[in-house]
């Protein structure tokens, strides 16, 4: 069962070009966790469904999946630094934030969650998020960390604050983790992330 402010997985969304993702502009922020590999499937499915997907990556994320992978899957440039495309007349982070229909941060590590909640904007993911009006554009966070990190009081405080600030937290799953333990904190599967994103887009429609 989802807690208030959380998003529970729902039924699989329609992913054809006439479905909920068609012609939608989706920002996907990838941060430094092993679950980043799952986001490849999410980006591929969104692109196949007709979405315009822009992938943002923290420096740590590029250690798990290369930017060229997401570029190939999305068919669009991938941003790994706030200093890319500075020749544009429209500041990159403002432009991406203003035109997005939804944003998904996956995996959202313990560190990234803390930095989002405390207003940091020093990498391309947090910078773009800082410019999104969450009253108009849904921003989903998919936490991914081991069980001990998930249950830290600081993490639970940050989750509560994130929900209070209008972020939609996708409840993590329980299961086998990369640290060779079983517990809560496992990032949901791509189908669950897509379902949560589809539900958020449906809720956000006028």
PLM feature spans:
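A cross-family phosphate/adenosyl-ligand binding-site feature
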Residues: 1-141, 147-206
């Amino acid at each position: 069962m989802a807690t208030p402010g959380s998003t529970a997985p729902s039924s699989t969304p329609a992913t054809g070009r006439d479905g909920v993702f068609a012609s939608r502009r989706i920002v996907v922020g990838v941060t430094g966790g092993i679950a980043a590999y799952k986001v490849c499937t999410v980006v591929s499915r969104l692109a196949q469904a007709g979405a315009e997907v822009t992938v943002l990556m923290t420096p740590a994320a590029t250690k798990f999946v290369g930017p060229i992978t997401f570029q190939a899957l999305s068919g669009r440039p991938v941003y790994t630094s706030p200093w890319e495309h500075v020749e544009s007349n429209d500041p990159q982070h403002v432009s991406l934030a203003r035109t997005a229909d939804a944003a998904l941060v996956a995996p959202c590590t313990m560190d990234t969650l803390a930095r989002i909640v405390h207003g940091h904007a020093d990498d391309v993911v947090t910078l773009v998020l800082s410019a999104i009006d969450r009253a108009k554009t849904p921003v989903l966070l998919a936490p991914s960390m081991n069980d001990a990190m998930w249950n830290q009081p600081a993490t639970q405080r940050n989750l509560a604050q994130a929900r209070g600030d209008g972020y939609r937290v996708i409840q993590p799953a329980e299961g086998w983790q990369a640290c060779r333990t079983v517990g809560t904190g496992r990032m949901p599967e791509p189908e669950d992330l897509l379902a949560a994103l589809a539900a958020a887009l449906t809720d956000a429609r006028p």
